[in-house]
């Protein structure tokens, strides 16, 4: 998933796409901020990543599975989500549709 997110960030970031990774740790060592920073560098993640140690964001989206992708429009409404790997073309099509929308 990270390669696709990286590609979309680089391709559409200047067109308004904002990518934010949500890191919800599964293991105790993943809670350490330095370990997360190392992983961001090692995996060449160019977009923002938040550390969700207490799971507040995870719970707010009623998330039970990862990876999960959410697309939120410019007005803050959830417009698309996908659970698991795959559906990359469908997700990119949804990104393009949202970027094409105009807002007052």
Where are these regions (language model features)?
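Short, solvent-exposed loop/turn and secondary-structure capping segments
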Residues: 1-2, 32, 61, 81-83, ...
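Conserved helix-turn-beta segment immediately C-terminal to the redox Cys motif
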Residues: 1-23, 40-43, 97
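Short, internal strand/loop/helix patches
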Residues: 18, 34-73
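Thiol-/selenol-based redox modules, centered on thioredoxin-like
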Residues: 16, 65-104
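Extracytoplasmic/secreted proteins, especially bacterial periplasmic and envelope-associated proteins
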Residues: 4-7, 31, 35-38, 56, ...
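Generic structural signal for helix capping and beta-alpha/helix-loop junctions
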Residues: 27-29, 57, 86
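Residue-level recognition of beta-strand->loop/alpha-helix junctions
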Residues: 23-25, 51
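A short acidic, helix-capping loop that chelates divalent metal ions and anchors anionic groups
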Residues: 22, 30, 78
